[in-house]
């Protein structure tokens, strides 16, 4: 079974979490050909937001994504089509750190009149599974999980592709311990 580890970055504002306004601005993903394998392929694209095309200063500082990065990017429908094509026809399990990424995919698909592919329905919330397997009372962030495992953060936190790579490192510990996920 293949695993696609995805991390999204979205428009954001200081002290405001408004899901109706948030739009995906980066899709980062890595493919794990098996639960205990290393990433073999990567997908990294910026997305041009349409509701509020100007990134807030807070968003730019948090993500290090610059205005020119999203200005040069395609809008969500085109980038999402590329991502779906990249995932391929073979079955896979979509993995993310928490439920946010899958929710944001649904929101952006609905906003643009797109259907979320059925293949995205097989999803593992790695944040929840990590807390369960580590015996934690409360889930922790990605950086906390890396620290718990004795792994350093690599790359830039809150960048889709870098976070996807880091989450894949955590996934390599978690996925082999989960019940087998069949086709």
Task: Report the location of each language-model feature.
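Metal-dependent phosphoesterase signature
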Residues: 61-80
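Short acidic, Gly/Ser-rich segments with clustered Asp/Glu that frequently serve as metal-coordination loops
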Residues: 8-17
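Metal-dependent phosphoesterase core characteristic of DEDDh/y 3'-5' exonuclease domains
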Residues: 2, 20-27, 31-63, 84-183
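N-terminal accessory regions of nucleic-acid-interacting proteins
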Residues: 1-8
